[in-house]
A protein has these predicted regions:
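The feature captures the beta-strand-to-loop junction immediately N-terminal to the Walker
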Residues: 36-38
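Conserved ABC transporter NBD signature motif
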Residues: 59-70, 75
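Conserved ABC ATPase "signature" region
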Residues: 99, 103, 111-127
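Hydrophobic anchor residue at the start of the ABC signature
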Residues: 145
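Catalytic Walker B motif of ABC-type/P-loop ATPase nucleotide-binding domains
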Residues: 156-159
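H-loop/switch region of ABC-family ATPase nucleotide-binding domains
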Residues: 191-192
C-alpha cells in the first residue's frame, strides 16, 4: 500500500528544548492515523513539521514520498490543515468565511459545493447566513472542518479536531472521518481523546515526552481496544 506520510527518525528542538526524539511512523494511503498524547507530548510539533513550519534537527518528514523540506510548495498543495484554534472572522457568516479563505487558497467552490461541505459537517442550514459571533465554539469548529474539506486535498492534518464539540457532534465527526478515509483520503490527526482515537483510527501512535512509546493497529473487525490504549496512555499495564 502506498505511503502518504512518513516520519523517519524525526528529532525537533524548539526554544532549546527537544520536543520530538527520534520519532518514526508512517500513514498508509486511505488510512486514519491518530497520534495520541497528553499536553506537551509533541503532537502539534509533528503536524507543524509535516507542514514545513518547523524544520527537524535530524530525520526526515515526507509527504507522498517527497521530503517536506525539498518540496514545500507542492506538499502544501496536497495537504489541508485544521489547527486546533482555526482563524475565522466573527463578523462574517459561514459562507463569507469559506468564500474568503478559499479565495486565499485559490480554490474555486460554488454555493452548492459549500452547502454540500456544510451538510457533511452537520451545520444547520438556518445558521449558515448568521455571523460567526453568534455561533458556539462547536459550530465554528464545523465551519473550519468544512474549509478543510473544500480544499479537496488527498491528505488531511487535523489538530485536536473534536475540541469544543458535544458528544453527538463528536460521533458525527468520527463517522465523517471514516467516510473520508473510505473515499481514499489519508488522515493524520493528533488528539488526547483515547475513546475517539480508538473509534476512528486504523492505527494509533502513542507519544510521551516527545518519544513514540506505543503503537496499536485496528483489527480486521471492530475497533482498537480502548482499555489497552487507555492503560498505555496512563502508563500502566492493561488488566
Amino acid at each position: 500500500m502506498e505511503t502518504a506520510l512518513s516520519a523517519e527518525a524525526l528529532t525537533v528542538t524548539r526554544s532549546g528544548q527537544t520536543v520530538l526524539k527520534d520519532v518514526s511512523f508512517s500513514v498508509s494511503a486511505g488510512d486514519v492515523y491518530a497520534l495520541l498524547g497528553g499536553n506537551g507530548a509533541g503532537k502539534s510539533t509533528t503536524l507543524l513539521t509535516f507542514l514545513g513550519f518547523l524544520s527537524p534537527d535530524s530525520g526526515t518528514a515526507k509527504v507522498l514520498g517527497e521530503s517536506v523540506a525539498a518540496n514545500l510548495k507542492t506538499i502544501r498543495q496536497s495537504t489541508a490543515y485544521l489547527p486546533e484554534a482555526a482563524t475565522l472572522y466573527q463578523h462574517l457568516n459561514a459562507y463569507e468565511n469559506l468564500d474568503y479563505f478559499l479565495s486565499l487558497a485559490k480554490v474555486r467552490a460554488d454555493r452548492a459545493a459549500i452547502d454540500a461541505a456544510l451538510d457533511r459537517v452537520s451545520l444547520q442550514a438556518d445558521a449558515r447566513s448568521n455571523r460567526l459571533s453568534t455561533y458556539s465554539k462547536g459550530m465554528r469548529q464545523k465551519v473550519a472542518i468544512a474549509l478543510a474539506l473544500l480544499r479537496d486535498t488527498p491528505i488531511l492534518l487535523l489538530d485536536e479536531p473534536t475540541s469544543g464539540l458535544d458528544p453527538v457532534a463528536i460521533d458525527e465527526f468520527n463517522t465523517l472521518v471514516r467516510s473520508l478515509a473510505e473515499e481514499g483520503r489519508s488522515i493524520l490527526m493528533v488528539t488526547h481523546d483515547v475513546y475517539g482515537a480508538c473509534q476512528v483510527a486504523d492505527r494509533i501512535g502513542l507519544l510521551r515526552n516527545g518519544e513514540l512509546v506505543g503503537a496499536f493497529d485496528r483489527p480486521e473487525s471492530g475497533q482498537i481496544d480502548t482499555e489497552a490504549v487507555h492503560a498505555a496512555f496512563a502508563g500502566r499495564s492493561a488488566a
